[in-house]
């Protein structure tokens, strides 16, 4: 039986609570959270510097010492109709979902080794690996996608198609809880979090 950590929550450098990503402020406002901005973390950069391209999700977090969260944020508000955005959104979101799935895959691949060489967040990454290996625990993957949308109905239909695509691409993860939400709905799936547009 693996012992949960009790000492690292208060002094880990992972214990910051306020992050900005794509013009959105994420406030993880409970001591139950331990979160890192993984795409900027040394653990990810060590791999991505050595091997391009290696991708990462925006946030990697543990809630209440027992639930692992991978969160990717895409804010296309004001840019939904740009050529570059349209390219990513085409084919019913196929390319966007592929990119998000790759970030999930690469994050899990790099995080497995992080516990070996991460000096400042070793306990954090060790706990993440324990959670990854515990098949009683679901890995929560949240894609937070913000768009300029014509109608609510169209938006819901699109999200449901995207969700199926993302689930297919991450089916190998087995016990994963996958959701795609706009900002306004994100607190329903991300506990103890306050999210605001900057």
Predicted ranges, named:
Residues 2-57, 191-198:
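Basic, amphipathic N-terminal segments that precede the first structured/catalytic domain
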Residues 55-57, 69, 139:
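Residue-level detector of short, conserved catalytic/binding motifs and their immediate flanks
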Residues 76-144, 165-174:
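Catalytic cores of nucleic-acid endonucleases
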